[in-house]
A protein has these predicted regions:
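Active-/binding-site microenvironments in catalytic and ligand-binding cores
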Residues: 22-273
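Bacterial N-terminal signal peptides
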Residues: 7-21
Length: 273
């Protein structure tokens, strides 16, 4: 973990130094010192035997290949990963719902790094598992916290991360296959609100702490289409959003770079200054 944190710091520092986030160019020691004093929040569920996947997908598997002493006298361990693109904390690439959209390896890295806001919709979602976040929710948030910055990463906190890893509570069902898809019941983002985020706030990306940016009962996935057809990637199954402030923090969301991928596992880190 220590090595990971140091690696994250180095990456964030690089973004500040060379302008990945569009904030600066060149070397600024002050930015590095600010990062040294920053707090990092991991927004990623660990992948393991209890990782939640879409009802039609196979479970994540870590298959042991070798572990032990070698003839050369040194210890060696290696595993093989078996996983769906769209399971656990992951990204949806535009091609997931747009035949002309960007594949995972084609998404500009600028989409993964930037200032972010957290929209807390946990109260209405607690009352209604089928709640869809509306434009009015965004207008009310802006009345309380100020305008959502243009080109921000918007994170929607439904409160459903607290149910992880219970499939029954998180997805609304333990059923698998098509029957399981038909029984899904969790909140999401209304397609009209998604269109508003794209047109009025030019968002970089949208994330949510449920299994899908569309609510569970969706059959046409209009919200996916509204975002991905405009090359706005989606982050799903986020964790620990409750630990974030409402605004003025940064996000680094780096997916595995898969050629031709429609999605993939995502490590998401918030940087609190």
């Amino acid at each position: 973990m220590k090595g990971l944190v140091h690696g994250v710091c180095a990456l964030v520092a690089a973004s500040y130094w060379v302008g990945i986030a569009g904030c600066t160019s060149g070397y600024h020691r002050g930015n590095y010192l600010a990062l040294e004093q920053a707090r990092f929040v991991d927004l990623t569920h660990a992948f393991g035997a209890d990782t939640i996947v879409w009802p039609t997908e196979g479970d994540f598997r870590l298959v042991g290949q070798q572990a032990g002493e070698t003839p050369g006298g040194y210890y060696y361990a290696s595993n093989r990963l078996e996983m769906a693109e769209h399971g656990g904390t992951h990204i949806d690439a535009p091609i997931h719902f747009d035949k002309n959209g960007q594949t995972l390896d084609q998404i500009p890295i600028e989409r993964f790094v930037g200032t972010a806001v957290r929209i807390d919709v946990s109260t209405p979602c607690a009352r209604d598992r089928g709640y869809r976040v509306s434009t009015r929710d965004f207008e009310q948030w802006e009345a309380a916290h100020g305008r959502i910055p243009n080109r921000a990463i918007v994170l929607l906190e439904t409160g459903f991360a607290r149910f992880w890893p219970s499939r029954k509570e998180y997805l609304g069902t333990e059923l698998r296959g098509r029957e399981g898809v038909g029984a899904l019941h969790f909140p999401g983002l209304h397609p009209d609100a998604a269109t508003w985020l794209v047109r009025e706030r030019q968002v970089k990306a949208v994330g949510i702490d449920t299994a899908s940016i569309d609510y569970g009962q969706s059959t046409q996935f209009e919200t996916h289409v509204a975002l991905l057809s405009r090359n706005v990637p989606v982050f799903e199954n986020l964790a620990n959003l409750r630990a974030l402030p409402d605004r003025d923090f940064d996000i680094i969301a780096l997916p595995m770079k898969i050629s031709g991928g429609t999605g993939g596992p995502l490590r998401v880190v918030a940087v609190l200054h």
